[in-house]
């Protein structure tokens, strides 16, 4: 796996969950002898929704909701075979989306 790079993108609604998962990946990669760059926090996407409270009248009565999508980026430089095996066996928390690309 010479001159390889593994890029890992993580997405989650809960920032504590994504930070814990990122820390677990970093510890696993370092334990197997790989060099890690990151975690790099990417911009948080904020989606806002405005909903009318009443079914008929009172246009002024509204509720506002927000969903925040937190993102992190990790680069594992020069991974070993042990690193790839350990990352495949790693069990992350539910609610964290993981995208892995080889470059």
Swiss-Prot record:
The keyword Ribosomal protein appears for this protein: yes
Any Pfam family the entry gives: Ribosomal_S10
UniProt keyword list: Ribonucleoprotein, Ribosomal protein
Gene3D superfamilies noted in UniProt: Ribosomal protein S10 domain (3.30.70.600)
Biological process per Gene Ontology, one example term: translation
Coiled-coil regions, chain positions: none
Keyword Ribosomal protein: yes
Gene Ontology molecular function: structural constituent of ribosome; tRNA binding
GO cellular component terms attached to this protein's record: ribonucleoprotein complex; ribosome
InterPro entries named in the record: Ribosomal_uS10, Ribosomal_uS10_CS, Ribosomal_uS10_dom, Ribosomal_uS10_dom_sf
Domain of life, source organism: Bacteria
PROSITE patterns referenced in this protein's UniProt entry, alphabetically: RIBOSOMAL_S10
Function: Involved in the binding of tRNA to the ribosomes.
Family statement: Belongs to the universal ribosomal protein uS10 family.
Binding partners and assembly: Part of the 30S ribosomal subunit.
Protein name in UniProt: Small ribosomal subunit protein uS10
Organism name: Cellvibrio japonicus (strain Ueda107)
């Amino acid at each position: 796996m010479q001159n390889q790079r593994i890029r890992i993108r993580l997405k989650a609604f809960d920032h504590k969950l994504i930070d814990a998962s990122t820390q677990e990946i970093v510890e696993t990669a370092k334990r197997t002898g790989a060099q890690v760059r990151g975690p790099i926090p990417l911009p948080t996407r904020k989606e806002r929704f405005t909903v009318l409270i009443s079914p008929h009248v009172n246009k002024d009565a509204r509720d506002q909701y927000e969903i925040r999508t937190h993102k992190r980026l990790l680069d594992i430089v020069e991974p070993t075979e042990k690193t790839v095996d350990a990352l495949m066996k790693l069990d992350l928390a539910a609610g964290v989306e993981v995208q892995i690309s080889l470059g």
